[in-house]
Amino acid sequence: MAKERCLKKSFQDSLEDIKKRMKEKRNKNLAEIGKRRSFIAAPCQIITNTSTLLKNYQDNNKMLVLALENEKSKVKEAQDIILQLRKECYYLTCQLYALKGKLTSQQTVEPAQNQEICSSGMDPNSDDSSRNLFVKDLPQIPLEETELPGQGESFQIEDQIPTIPQDTLGVDFDSGEAKSTDNVLPRTVSVRSSLKKHCNSICQFDSLDDFETSHLAGKSFEFERVGFLDPLVNMHIPENVQHNACQWSKDQVNLSPKLIQPGTFTKTKEDILESKSEQTKSKQRDTQERKREEKRKANRRKSKRMSKYKENKSENKKTVPQKKMHKSVSSNDAYNFNLEEGVHLTPFRQKVSNDSNREENNESEVSLCESSGSGDDSDDLYLPTCKYIQNPTSNSDRPVTRPLAKRALKYTDEKETEGSKPTKTPTTTPPETQQSPHLSLKDITNVSLYPVVKIRRLSLSPKKNKASPAVALPKRRCTASVNYKEPTLASKLRRGDPFTDLCFLNSPIFKQKKDLRRSKKRALEVSPAKEAIFILYYVREFVSRFPDCRKCKLETHICLR
């Protein structure tokens, strides 16, 4: 035990050991941090001076400017190359058309020489390749210009036309395609074959918009015929080609040169004039036929209208209708259902019954028939068939719900006097006196501007007969304003059932409560005997409405006893 105590370290020694351990840990941590920061630039290496930063920016800008200039120069070079290639394409197309002109001139002027050349060359039927025109090993010879017959002006190409290379150039006349050694033409040249007319097939060659907008556009000129000197002897022309002619149309190239075989130009002009005259004649025929059809339709409509008018007039003279509807009945009453089924207005066309009476003015009806179309054919304003006033004999069975109006008394006696006679409308009365007093709100949407409808609505002349007694008619409601408030509970109950009892609605069950205090006081004041009477009355009404309910019948019998 004593040895262990002697071996124990003092407090200071232990502190020093702890300090050493802490230093070692610090060194280890610093070494690890240094290894990690070796990838990152040290703070001493970071540039903090503004002058050096500006220099770096300037250097970067210079490099960017140089790169831009280099790219621009490359773009300019590419554009120059494109322009040069386009020029070469233009020159090649000019050479093509010059060769075509030479061929057409040889075919028209020297057919005998062409036949001799064909006989000296290979047979046309020996090989399929013999159909192509070959120009082989042509020396570089400038093109000669010869004037066409009948032309005063000549076209000269500004730049030098490059001569044809020594490679072979072939033109297939049967297919209408131009071929080189690679069998490919530039994209700006397109070839298509046209129809044969007057035993001469015309080949039209079209170039793209680049050639149209070039220095050739905007000038009216024609190529001059170009001829080669010696190498034409080696050319082999088949018999199928001798009747071909090449034309460069003005529609394809704006004011561009065209090569036309003499003799065909006048024929094409005559054809164009003939086609134009035929078109004008056909248009005139079409217009005449349309006018005739319209006149026929109008005559048919008039005849139909007149026939209908005559039939209706004859029916009016024979019999007087027995069933007529009065317009004033329930015109503004939304909840009167006595005559609802009879007065059913629809916005569609109504089929008039055979016994309907039509009083019409002759002159106005004829003018309306002429102006408007018939039925489905016309698009005129739709005039609905009018409802007429009811006879008092047919309306005698209907219960009278309102007292008689003063205005209705004027027309009652006339129905009795004219019941056996056919009614006729006055033709000399002005439209102001002919307006119907029974015009209601429901007919406002269907009112037309024609006076004929007004004449129809007044089917009875306003004559008075003092001796005749007054017949009860339903009162016309004269309210000009419309009430849009919510209907009361009584009107709601009357809406569906016309047999409800008005006294039953006086019960306190159906009275609306305005204030809670008043309702409480009234409920307290009501005696139990009165409540029992009201309940019995309610049960009776329920049984009358629903007679199939047996329980209610038993309860009513018990309560009544």
From Swiss-Prot:
Domain of life: Eukaryota
Chain intervals for the UniProt region annotation (Disordered): 260-331, 348-441
Keyword Cell inner membrane: no
Keyword Translocase among record annotations: no
Keywords: Cell cycle, Cell division, Centromere, Chromosome, Chromosome partition, Coiled coil, Cytoplasm, Cytoskeleton, Disease variant, Kinetochore, Mitosis, Nucleus, Phosphoprotein, Ubl conjugation
Motif (KEN box): 310-312
Tissue expression per record: Widely expressed. Highly expressed in testis. Expressed in lung, small intestine, breast, liver and placenta. Strongly overexpressed in 90% of breast cancers tested.
Extent of motif PXVXL/I motif: 451-455
Motif interval(s): D-box 2: 438-446
Coiled coil regions in record: 7-89, 273-313
InterPro entries: Shugoshin1/2, Shugoshin_C, Shugoshin_N
Post-translational modification: Ubiquitinated and degraded during mitotic exit by APC/C-Cdh1.
Motif (D-box 3): 457-465
Entry remark concerning the domains of this protein: The KEN box and D-box 3 are required for its ubiquitination and degradation.
Family: Belongs to the shugoshin family.
Listed name of the protein: Shugoshin 1
Gene it is expressed from: SGO1
